[in-house]
């Protein structure tokens, strides 16, 4: 019974991993990856409520995570962005809206299933306005 369950889980993990789109090779130019948030951070850019959302700048503490590590981030957007989601195939984070065009998040990485480790995933940062229109930016996120 245990062998069948393990085989089913392993097969499902392989199928899910195979379904993931091409992982980007690097972060876009408006991303900063460093241990501390950049001192000169842009304010939210003014935008009409019905204008398309726009991600101006993204800061992440790292693009390599492991169980027990933390992941911090800040996203500067246009002022019409209602929500920012940070997502991979393994997890999803809803960022805190701290000011017009400003979003932050902090999360501690919990234990990862063995099949999810030692893999590079696509990290999606999704900004949405109130109409649900989205802008997505992607970077590689390595799980150890």
Residue ranges of predicted features:
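Short, compositionally biased P/S/T/A/G/V-rich stretches that sit at domain boundaries
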Residues: 24-71, 76
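Surface-exposed, short loops/turns at beta-strand junctions within beta-sandwich domains
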Residues: 111-119
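Edge beta-strands of extracellular beta-sandwich domains
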Residues: 133-142
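Aromatic sugar-binding surface patches on proteins
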Residues: 99-110
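C-terminal motif of bacterial Sec signal peptides marking the signal peptidase cleavage site
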Residues: 16-18
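Bacterial signal peptide processing site
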Residues: 20-22
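Short proline/glycine-enriched turn/loop motifs at strand-loop junctions of beta-rich domains
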Residues: 76-82
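Conserved structural position at the C-terminal beta-strand
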Residues: 125-127
């Amino acid at each position: 019974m245990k062998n069948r369950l393990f085989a089913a889980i392993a097969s499902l993990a392989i199928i899910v991993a195979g379904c993931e789109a091409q992982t980007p090779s690097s972060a876009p130019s408006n991303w900063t990856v460093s241990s501390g948030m950049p001192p000169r951070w842009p304010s939210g850019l003014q935008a009409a409520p019905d204008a398309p959302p726009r991600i101006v700048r993204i800061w992440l503490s790292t693009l390599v995570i492991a169980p027990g590590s933390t992941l911090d981030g800040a996203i500067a957007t246009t002022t019409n962005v209602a929500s920012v989601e940070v997502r991979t195939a393994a997890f999803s984070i809803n960022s805190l809206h701290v000011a017009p065009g400003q979003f932050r998040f902090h999360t501690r990485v919990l234990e990862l299933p063995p099949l999810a480790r030692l893999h590079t995933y696509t990290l999606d940062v999704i900004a949405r306005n109130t109409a649900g229109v989205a802008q997505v930016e992607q970077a590689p996120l390595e799980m150890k």
